[in-house]
Amino acid sequence: MERYVTRPGVVLCSVCGEYLLVAAKEAREHCPYVTQINESAASYWKLLDRPYSIDELTERAAEVFQKEKKDLLLPILLFIRKLEKSGYLIGEDENDA
């Protein structure tokens, strides 16, 4: 099962009501220096305090935001895919760990 974790050296910042992911130090080798994300994505990012599978992250988000898992699955999938593709998230296979 693949789990996702934030790339070390990437921080979430809030500037004038906008959410930005900023890559510092070595993280810049793997992702753009800065990207803007929406409020929902920022909320999901804050939940990634350790590696989570998509199902685990969806479960945690449902508990925290008091929403149905089925309503969160697609937004979380899109969040994971976009940020993994751009390098801000790292996918780790449990079998490789």
Where are these regions (language model features)?
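Acidic, low-complexity/disordered tracts enriched in E/D and polar residues
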Residues: M1-K46, G91-A97
